[in-house]
Swiss-Prot record:
Gene Ontology CC terms, in alphabetical order: plasma membrane; respiratory chain complex I
Subunit field text: NDH-1 is composed of 14 different subunits. Subunits NuoB, C, D, E, F, and G constitute the peripheral sector of the complex.
Enzyme class: translocase
UniProt-annotated binding residues for [4Fe-4S] cluster: C37, C38, C103, C132
SUPFAM superfamilies named in the record: HydA/Nqo6-like
Role, per record: NDH-1 shuttles electrons from NADH, via FMN and iron-sulfur (Fe-S) centers, to quinones in the respiratory chain. The immediate electron acceptor for the enzyme in this species is believed to be a menaquinone. Couples the redox reaction to proton translocation (for every two electrons transferred, four hydrogen ions are translocated across the cytoplasmic membrane), and thus conserves the redox energy in a proton gradient.
Cellular location(s): Cell membrane
Cofactor(s) needed: [4Fe-4S] cluster
Keywords: 4Fe-4S, Cell membrane, Iron, Iron-sulfur, Membrane, Metal-binding, NAD, Quinone, Translocase, Transport
Signal peptide: none
Name of the protein in its database record: NADH-quinone oxidoreductase subunit B
Record-listed E.C. numbers: 7.1.1.-
Catalytic reactions on record: a quinone + NADH + 5 H(+)(in) = a quinol + NAD(+) + 4 H(+)(out)
Length: 184
């Protein structure tokens, strides 16, 4: 029994934002930015055992211009940070970022001058995925949570304001390396 049989007269009510969110969530094309051991777990997620294609993500994009999800897997060095930002800027709107692993989320065990202490100091992050490295099941769960977040995103001018506020808030936070004396 389908939805058409339940509603009288074939009427289906929704908003444009909900329909667009549903379509966007079902067709994510991730750009992989695998830098360390988390990339191995990300590759196994695309394998037949976990089958990431169930979520419309069977195509990993090699170019940022065709991707709308950046999965940052692993630590980001200070020299790699401008490259990461450039790749993020080349992605078309709408775009989302998933920080995979504790190194991408907070620098991990690499608390030194050469490693960015959280990729959120370079690009705005939508989903943080903890673990060292996180299991493929955790990545699939994070993708499901990202789908829920995408379906709630506004469109048009409201989306532009939400993106601008999120990016300014993420970049205004002091980096962990500046707080180094306070953490010990």
């Amino acid at each position: 029994m389908g939805l058409e049989e339940r509603l009288p007269g074939g009427i289906l009510l929704s908003t444009v934002e909900k329909v667009a969110g549903y379509v966007r969530a079902g067709s994510l094309w991730p750009a992989t930015f695998g830098l360390a051991c988390c990339a191995i777990e990300m590759m196994s997620t695309a394998g037949p055992r976990f089958d990431i294609s169930r979520f419309g993500m069977e195509r990993f994009s090699a170019t940022p211009r065709q991707a709308d999800l950046m999965i940052v897997a692993g630590r980001v060095s200070q020299k790699m940070a401008p490259v990461l930002r450039q790749i993020y800027d080349q992605m078309a709107e709408p775009k989302w970022v998933l920080a995979m692993g504790v190194c991408a989320s907070s620098g991990g065990m690499f608390n030194n001058y050469a490693i960015v202490q959280g990729v959120d100091h370079v690009v705005p992050v939508d989903i943080y995925l903890p673990g060292c490295p996180p299991r493929p099941e955790m990545l699939l769960h994070a993708i499901i949570k990202l789908h829920e977040k995408i379906q709630q995103m506004p469109l048009g001018v409201n989306r532009d304001e939400a993106i601008r506020e999120a990016e300014q808030a993420a970049l205004a936070v002091p980096s962990t390396i500046e707080l180094k004396g306070l953490l010990r």
